[in-house]
Swiss-Prot record:
It comes from the Viruses. Seems to play a role in virus replication. This is Replication-associated protein.
Amino acid sequence: MTPMRITVWRKRLQQMRPQRKLLKQTQQRRLLHQLQQRKLLQQTSL
């Protein structure tokens, strides 16, 4: 591997990291939302 490629790869990794964080956050939010909806559904069905 050439040093140039390594730096490019590192840059790409650094760019990917925040995106991954965002992805995790959105997934957690979606899960929370689904849970809330389910709770609501249970309440209305009671």
